[in-house]
Amino acid sequence: MLITTTPTIEGRKILHYRGLVTGETIIGANIFRDILASITDVIGGRSKAYEDALMTARDNAIEEMKNRATLMQANAIVGVDLDYEVFGEGGMMMVSVSGTAVLLEGGTGVPLA
């Protein structure tokens, strides 16, 4: 499935707009990860533990969005937007992704009437 932040895909015609698709993931802060991150912050550098958690959360949200687009018989998602939101006094983070599921010409999927 093609996924892009742009509203169109160059060289491909959009036959049908299937609708909005979203994916969300919520991750909680781990106390041990927080301790390691604070040590990293003191000595400088990047926190691999946090980066890995964010990448996993992002990938899960995108996969959820792709699954929803597949159920709508889409073969691409355009106009994708990715957001990160911290809530619960910094104890939780939500990764959300949204876009428009579409059926591109020359791809798999069945045009809906």
Curated annotation (Swiss-Prot):
<protein>
    <recommendedName>
        <fullName>UPF0145 protein SynWH7803_1684</fullName>
    </recommendedName>
</protein>
<comment type="similarity">
    <text>Belongs to the UPF0145 family.</text>
</comment>
<dbReference type="InterPro" id="IPR035439">
    <property type="entry name" value="UPF0145_dom_sf"/>
</dbReference>
<dbReference type="InterPro" id="IPR002765">
    <property type="entry name" value="UPF0145_YbjQ-like"/>
</dbReference>
<dbReference type="Pfam" id="PF01906">
    <property type="entry name" value="YbjQ_1"/>
</dbReference>
